[in-house]
């Protein structure tokens, strides 16, 4: 019988029957925990109950998470048939439909705003909370990444199911805004509640990275590996482990992780490809010979090139193509983003993305002075392309290396000093890039 049920967290859910609700809940919980098969779960939910409208919208969300042209097209195919049904939708379904529709249309800001309205409608809508934070992450809107969780914290007492997920989300927001002590407290509270909370583990890994507590980071991820290694987010966690080894100049260990859990499966998902490109780029900055790895990664990257959708991805593709010497593909990405980017991505590309693409391409080609000009101008607004502070740290590292290789020793030393002051425990990586330590 059609009607309104509630999901696992007590939020109303418009359904055609009871059959799909548990499967829908499993899909949302899988997204929150970063474990399991969320796509399979939501497909099973709508197969059991085609009237589960939010299930169809979640299918679209999962396609959009791919941050690719193919993902957008798949989402549009799911969302378009729902337009005629809008008059019969509940408030929650309407707000989520608007969010997914805006995201698919390229208006990522409006998508986030619709999810904020969904949280005003019901502050315990965990689906809205998770996707809103992820969108703010994609948008580089660091303050909103934290505040969207702050506003609903009081709605989540410790005894309520889902509390641990909310603590993990809040921990990551605190970390990205530089409140490392509070981030660690909330992350550890979440992990005490649920040791398999991958987002909380991720937040704590970021704290260790940003504070230069490398030994603690290695120990934490090693001791907790059984809790996160089966996650579909595991490649990114292994990337953090590799960064710790890189900070300690343990290049063989970092390469071993690259060859093992990071690239063994040769995933063609952007979330995995960007980690691979970033790691190889950083290793090369340190003068490490990565062999044929860059050529192999470039082949994989070339397979997923599509209409420009998220310039953060294309920036990392430039890293891979630059290392492999594929100037034609670098130029294609620059041209495509200038001519065909739309919506939020077009604005972000104009503000910072194009400068990052050209700056990294220039560095790869040995045009270090041009790289200096571009990266110096863009570094203060690079956050708009999205990603975390740890991911965007590669901008400063590349600028230091460019200054060093261009013979701008004074600039290089000042940049290293600035980075060391900002991250006292992580000064070694910058220092190695000074003249004589990198080639």
Protein language model features and the residues they cover:
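Residue-level signature for tetratricopeptide repeat
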Residues: 29-30, 62, 101-102, 135, ...
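Generic helix N-cap/helix-start motif at coil->alpha-helix transitions
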Residues: 18-23, 51-53, 89-95, 122-129, ...
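Internal metal/ion-chelating core segments
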Residues: 148-248
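Helix-coil-helix junctions within alpha-helical repeat/solenoid scaffolds
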Residues: 242-439
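Canonical tetratricopeptide repeat
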Residues: 58, 131, 169, 203, ...
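Intrinsically disordered, charged and Pro/Gly-enriched terminal/linker segments
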Residues: 5-22, 84-96, 101-102, 409-412, ...
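Alpha-helical repeat scaffolds
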Residues: 41-44, 72-86, 109-119, 143-156, ...
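Inter-helical turn/loop elements of alpha-helical hairpins
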Residues: 21, 28-43, 47-51, 56-93, ...
């Amino acid at each position: 019988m059609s009607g309104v049920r509630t999901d696992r967290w007590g939020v109303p859910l418009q359904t055609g029957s009871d059959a799909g609700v548990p499967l829908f809940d499993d899909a949302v919980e899988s997204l929150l925990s970063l474990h399991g098969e969320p796509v399979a779960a939501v497909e099973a939910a709508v197969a059991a109950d085609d009237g589960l409208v939010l299930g169809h919208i979640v299918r679209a969300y999962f396609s959009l998470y791919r941050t690719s042209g193919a993902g957008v097209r798949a989402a549009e195919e799911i969302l378009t048939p729902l337009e005629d049904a809008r008059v019969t939708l509940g408030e929650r379904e309407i707000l989520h439909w608007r969010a997914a529709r805006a995201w698919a249309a390229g208006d990522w800001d409006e998508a986030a705003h619709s999810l904020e309205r969904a949280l005003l409608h019901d502050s315990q809508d965990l689906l809205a909370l998770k996707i809103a934070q992820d969108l703010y992450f994609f948008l580089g809107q660091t303050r909103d990444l934290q505040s969207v969780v702050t506003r609903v914290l009081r709605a989540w007492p410790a005894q309520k199911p889902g509390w641990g997920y909310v603590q993990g989300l809040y921990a990551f927001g605190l970390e990205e805004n530089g409140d490392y002590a509070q981030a660690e407290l909330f992350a550890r509270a979440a992990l005490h509640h649920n040791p398999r909370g991958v987002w909380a583990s991720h937040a704590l890994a970021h704290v260790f990275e940003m504070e230069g507590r490398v030994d603690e980071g290695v120990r934490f991820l090693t001791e907790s590996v059984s809790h996160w290694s089966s996650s579909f987010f595991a490649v990114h966690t292994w990337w953090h482990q590799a960064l710790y080894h890189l900070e300690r100049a343990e290049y063989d260990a970092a390469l071993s992780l690259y060859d093992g859990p990071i690239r063994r499966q040769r995933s063609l998902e952007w979330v995995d490809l960007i980690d691979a490109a970033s790691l190889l780029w950083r290793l090369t900055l340190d003068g490490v010979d990565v062999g044929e790895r860059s050529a192999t990664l470039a082949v994989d990257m070339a397979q997923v090139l599509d209409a420009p959708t998220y310039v953060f991805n294309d920036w990392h593709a430039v890293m891979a193509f630059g290392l492999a010497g594929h100037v034609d593909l670098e130029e294609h990405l620059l041209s495509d983003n200038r001519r065909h980017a739309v919506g939020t991505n077009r604005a972000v590309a104009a503000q910072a993305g194009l400068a990052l693409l050209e700056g990294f391409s220039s560095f790869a080609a040995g045009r270090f002075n041009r790289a200096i000009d571009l990266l110096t101008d863009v570094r203060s607004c690079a956050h708009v392309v999205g990603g975390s502070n740890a991911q965007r740290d590669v901008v400063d590292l590349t600028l230091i290396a460019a200054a060093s290789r261009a013979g701008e020793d004074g600039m290089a030393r000042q940049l290293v000093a600035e980075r060391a002051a900002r991250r006292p425990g992580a000064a070694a990586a910058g220092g190695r890039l000074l003249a004589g330590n990198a080639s």
